Amino acid sequence: MMMTKQKPTLTERLNLGDEVRELKLGATFNPKNTSTAFHTIKYDFKPASVDTSRMATVDVGSNNQVTVTVPNLESSGVPHTVYKGNHKKYTKECLIIYDKETGVITLEKLNHNIQVKKTRSEMTNKPSLMPAANAGPLMSGANGGGPIPSSMMAAAGSGSGTAPKLENSTMRISSKTKVSTGSRRNNIIDFKPRNSPMQQSSPSRPVVSHRSPQSAPAWHANNAQQTLPSIPMITDDDDFGLNAALHNGGGHANISGSSTGSSSGQPDYVSSSHMGKQRQALPQGHAKRQQMTQQRSSPPMHHQQHQNQQQQQQNYGRVGGSSNYAQQQHQQQMQQQQQQHQQQQQRASFSHSNHSNSMPLDINSPSHHDHVTQSVAQAAAVLEQQIGGEPSASSSSSESDSSDTDSGSDSDDSTDDDRPTQQKQQNSATHQQQHHQMQQQHQQQQQHMHQLPNLGLGSISPAYNSHYQHQQQQQQPPQQHSHHHHQQQQQQQQQQQQSGIYASNGGFPNDLLQNDLQLSSNSSDDDDD
């Protein structure tokens, strides 16, 4: 059999040469053979201290259990190495045996496959010795090129002249085992002090803390309540810094969160105190409004008294026959009214500015102010017309006197003979205009009655009063301007007094406004009748 192209080749190792050789079948192929059998042994570890001068033993027990005992050198300290395993029968595997002396190549069948592993325990059973004739085929089978693995060894043999070199690893294994167990014990010893609470005061904790990072999380997980020595020091410093900052007012970085929390909490306290002050101010404003309602009933009475005084003075002037005295009285009253008008405008504007600064919660629009001022002016005009429109001789004479005084003050060329005709014309014109104004006021009051629920507390600005009065002045004819000049001044005085009173408080309640409008509507209905 030629085998080429191998490093090293079988022919080179066995010195077979290039010639062709015959292959013979061995005794195992004879069915009558009962003495010859070939087995293979596969082991996991080969000791270096095997004594090749002595024979090894193979013991086949029950349940296919096999025990192989290999002797060791005396200097190794271990008498022999023991292998244990099981065996299986071969079905188609064969073994080639080459004889170097004769050059004969023989083919034999394999009987059993034995696989063993090294054990630490030593066997005391007596081994059964293999025949000497089987040693040669076992060695050749181990070194042959057949399907048998190269790691097989023969149990015993003397014909080949060389025994298998088995290494003893008992001492090496034991030393490795000791090292491995020692390292495990060291790890356990290192791990236990980590979990023990007595290690908090031990000086070896920094060394333990420099272990692998895999063991550090386990230490934290097992010691959730325990902390490193540096962590309590940091928390103690934080507490000390926080207390010192709270007592001494120091701005450390550790108390930034608490300082920001306190600073953010101050606006809430300020806003709550501000709201409390506003709530306290509301009852005070309500009390002021009640006082103003009491004072509000006085302007019509004051206005009536003022008109009665004027009528008495004018009648006194007519009875005495001194028109100069009446003109002087009228001029003095006009000057006083102008002075009062200026003072009330200043007071109303000052109170309105104060109200706009002190009451930022006023949400009324200028349209509301227009409605309020118009309703107040209408109520005042209706009251004045009721007083001036009574069917009495004194009122008619007072109106004629006032018209005479007005016409006398405007033009000095008029005489006493022309006065009755002028008075009739002026009275008829004033009556028609008053009737027309009453109809307009009644329509406006009906329109404003729907808007009364929407009216709130609002300030009455003098600018709106002056605008409304200017509109009334433009609506009047030029020939009647001199006659109603005195009445308009009285209306302005009353409206400014009321607006000054209301502006000082910042507004007036809705129920008072409704009462005035109802009173004015009743008076307008009486006049229409």
Swiss-Prot record:
From what superkingdom does this record's organism come?
Eukaryota
The keyword Membrane is assigned to this record:
no
In which residue ranges is the amino acid composition biased (Low complexity)?
A: 194-215, 256-265, 306-315, 327-346, 431-451, 469-480, 488-499, 510-523
Q: Which intervals carry biased composition (Acidic residues)? A: 401-416
Assigned keywords, A-Z:
Activator, Developmental protein, Nucleus, Phosphoprotein, Transcription, Transcription regulation
CC per GO annotation: nucleoplasm; super elongation complex
Output one GO BP term.
positive regulation of DNA-templated transcription
Q: What are the start and end residues of every segment in region (Disordered)?
A: 155-235, 253-529
Phosphoserine: which positions carry it? S196
Pfam families in the record: EAF (PF09816)
GO molecular function terms noted in the UniProt entry: transcription elongation factor activity
The listed locations are: Nucleus
Biased composition, class Polar residues, residue ranges: 167-186, 347-359
Family from the record = Belongs to the EAF family.
Q: What does this protein do?
A: Promotes transcriptional elongation by Su(Tpl)/ELL. Essential for development.
Protein name as it appears in the record: Ell-associated factor Eaf
Question: Which species is listed as the source?
Answer: Drosophila grimshawi (Hawaiian fruit fly)
The opening ranks of the lineage are: Eukaryota, Metazoa, Ecdysozoa, Arthropoda, Hexapoda
> Could you tell me the gene encoding this protein?
Eaf
